[in-house]
Curated annotation (Swiss-Prot):
This is Regulatory protein RecX. Its main location: cytoplasm. The gene is recX. Keywords: Cytoplasm. One of its GO terms (cellular component) is cytoplasm.
């Protein structure tokens, strides 16, 4: 049985850090900052962590740009998060501001508003409308606020979609 031997220039500690990073990356994609945090949490020295992470980036296993693009695509499609909420999520994951700006530059405000309208329409189908729209309105506004939409967008979309749903149910 043959085993792969690490190059002689790599210390045992670096090899352990590399194996840990590979195991973490096997589970799911992660940012450089997240991996650095995991290595620090387990007591690896900063210089060891930097060398391992630089090597992973050099071979293409660690790419914050790619991570950010995938994250934005996934969260917009599945959760319906706004540009502002996505930026906050990426900042929390340790992505650079320049990368965040680049990735979010492609989001069109009209498409974002359309997604908010779609979310409200979907939720309204399940709501029972009574004479008092305040409860339904409050719930819809809270849903959009949790997804990071601006107050202006929230108010405009909820008022318009509530009126459209009332008209649709009247017919």
């Amino acid at each position: 049985m043959t085993t792969s031997c690490p190059p002689p220039s790599i210390s045992d500690r670096e090899e352990q850090a590399r194996i840990l990073c590979l195991r973490l990356l096997t589970a799911r994609s992660r940012t450089r900052a997240q991996l650095f945090g995991q290595l620090a949490k387990r007591g690896y020295a900063d210089h060891v962590s930097e060398r391992v992470l630089d090597r992973l980036a050099a071979v293409g296993l660690l790419d914050d740009n790619d991570f950010a693009e995938q994250w934005v695509r996934s969260r917009r499609a599945n959760v319906g998060k706004s540009k502002r909420a996505l930026a906050a999520d990426l900042r929390a994951k340790g992505i650079d501001s320049e990368v965040i700006t680049t990735v979010l530059a492609g989001i069109d405000p009209a498409v974002e508003r359309e997604r908010a309208e779609q979310l409200v329409r979907t939720r309204l189908r399940r709501e029972v409308l009574s004479e008092d729209d305040a409860r339904v309105s409050r719930r819809l506004m809270a849903m959009l606020a949790r997804r990071g939409y601006s107050q202006t967008t929230i108010c405009e979309v909820v008022v318009a979609e509530l009126a459209a749903e009332r008209e649709r149910r009247r017919v």
